[in-house]
Structure formats: C-alpha cells, structure tokens
Curated annotation (Swiss-Prot):
Residues 89-101 have a biased composition (Polar residues). This is Small ubiquitin-related modifier 3. It is found in: Cytoplasm; Nucleus; Nucleus, PML body. Signal peptide: none annotated. Residues 93-110 form a propeptide. Belongs to the ubiquitin family. SUMO subfamily. The lineage of its organism: Eukaryota, Metazoa, Chordata, Craniata, Vertebrata. GO terms for biological process: positive regulation of ubiquitin-dependent protein catabolic process; protein localization to nucleus; protein sumoylation; regulation of protein localization to nucleus. It comes from Rattus norvegicus (Rat). Polymeric chains can be formed through Lys-11 cross-linking. Residues 15-92 form the Ubiquitin-like domain. Ubiquitin-like protein which can be covalently attached to target lysines either as a monomer or as a lysine-linked polymer. Does not seem to be involved in protein degradation and may function as an antagonist of ubiquitin in the degradation process. Plays a role in a number of cellular processes such as nuclear transport, DNA replication and repair, mitosis and signal transduction. Covalent attachment to its substrates requires prior activation by the E1 complex SAE1-SAE2 and linkage to the E2 enzyme UBE2I, and can be promoted by an E3 ligase such as PIAS1-4, RANBP2 or CBX4.
C-alpha cells in the first residue's frame, strides 16, 4: 500500500505545472496551475497581484502571444517555463526631438 501513495502523488504532480511570469521590471511571480486550465486564470491572478489591468499588458510564451483560452498543455509548456509580460504600447514612436544630436550637445563625443 505504501507504494501506491507515492504513485498517486506523482500523478497529481504531473497534472500541475509550475510557471514563472517575468515582468519587464525584472520581477518574477510563480504560479502553479493545472495543465488543462485556461491561462486566463493565471493572467487575471497576475494582474490582480501586480495591480495591473488585462488591457495594459500582453503575455507571451516563446515569443508568441498567449490567448486567454490557451492552456499549458496546448502550448506544450513544461515545468518551470517562463511567460513574459509586456506593457502594451499605445500611440506612435518616440519623437526624434527627444534624441540628443551632436548639434545640441557639442561637448559629447558620438
């Protein structure tokens, strides 16, 4: 009987996956989630913990966007894999006026 209990424990452990969510600021939040649970659950929990809105950020795994309906199993995620979080950019590009040029700073070597 004692041999069966570890097997059950292994089975339960295999049903879950540990994932890391890495923010642009270098912070890492760890989550344990079932392999067939939609990642929207993890995404919402991350936003609540960090005080962010789902509309402000985007989640990516291996460079690809994650949909709320995706599961770790569908994306072939493995234990300890990392999901990257990016602020959603709104608006255009940086203004050239904000980039220093030699004429504005003659003492700086370029």
């Amino acid at each position: 009987m004692s041999e069966e209990k570890p097997k059950e424990g292994v089975k339960t452990e295999n049903d879950h996956i540990n994932l890391k969510v890495a923010g642009q600021d270098g912070s890492v939040v760890q989550f344990k989630i079932k392999r067939h649970t939609p990642l929207s659950k993890l995404m919402k929990a991350y936003c609540e913990r960090q005080g962010l809105s789902m509309r402000q950020i985007r989640f990516r795994f291996d460079g690809q966007p994650i949909n709320e309906t995706d599961t770790p199993a569908q994306l072939e995620m493995e234990d300890e894999d990392t999901i990257d979080v990016f602020q959603q950019q709104t608006g255009g590009t940086a203004s050239r006026a904000s980039v220093p040029t030699p004429s504005h700073f003659p003492d700086i070597c370029y």
